[in-house]
Amino acid sequence: MERSQDGGNLSGVQHIILVLSGKGGVGKSTISTEIALALRHAGKKVGILDVDLCGPSIPRMLNAQSKDVHQCDSGWVPVYVDQEKSISLMSIGFLLEHPDDAVVWRGPKKNALIKQFASDVAWGDLDFLIVDTPPGTSDEHIATVDALRPFNPMGALLVTTPQAVSVGDVRRELTFCKKTGLRVIGIVENMSGYVCPHCTECTNIFSKGGGEELARLSGVPFLGCVPLDPLLSQSLEQGKDFVQEFPNSAAYPAISSIARQILDMASPRS
């Protein structure tokens, strides 16, 4: 699939990754946020497009919920979450009058905003655009894929937890990707065990290995397991940069490894 010649505001974006999950509560927005931070610390310019219209949590995760979106000649200027302007973010959370307002919209209005997000945000030059989607396979997902299709997305990253219910939902997500022609770049198993901070033993609080087995059976890459980590939860609650502040934490090696694999996939083949 060729990239559109008239790319508009996405013409300077090198790689677009959609982060999907079959169900809510698996930590999809967490993975989106932490991968963006890890890519940023690898020297890349990263944008995050939050199209989870009914649950926009990323502004809080990046301590950006009090910031405003401004207009320029080419559309909306995204919110920059660091002084170096190496991470930019667009979310409906910035457009609500009050942060606790509910988005009670029917499909056509949601789809129209998603199309506007895809065309009217002045991202500038980015190495990666991470698109955080709602759970499931709904109108919003179809609208997102259709809006980004002309720009040849790198693919979809699927997030699951070890339980059979979550893995079953991701199977349906794989079917969605196949039907819409969206390449799957990998599966991540989140909340995969708890590492004791004292003895470093990993206890599988849920089940084990569901995401890896699904990746094997589906013939898609398995990018790794991210364990439950109180420091990761703390950083998200406080809007801190987990990758920078907690390099010795249990989840850090897994997140760094996932980011490295994405960088390898994005590198030109020799």
From Swiss-Prot:
GO terms for molecular function: 4 iron, 4 sulfur cluster binding; ATP binding; ATP-dependent FeS chaperone activity; metal ion binding. SUPFAM superfamilies: P-loop containing nucleoside triphosphate hydrolases. [4Fe-4S] cluster binds at residues 196, 199. It is found in: Cytoplasm. Gene3D superfamilies: P-loop containing nucleotide triphosphate hydrolases. Component of the cytosolic iron-sulfur (Fe/S) protein assembly (CIA) machinery. Required for maturation of extramitochondrial Fe-S proteins. The nubp1-nubp2 heterotetramer forms a Fe-S scaffold complex, mediating the de novo assembly of an Fe-S cluster and its transfer to target apoproteins. Heterotetramer of 2 nubp1 and 2 nubp2 chains. HAMAP family: Mrp_NBP35 (MF_02040), NUBP2 (MF_03039). This is Cytosolic Fe-S cluster assembly factor nubp2. It comes from Xenopus tropicalis.
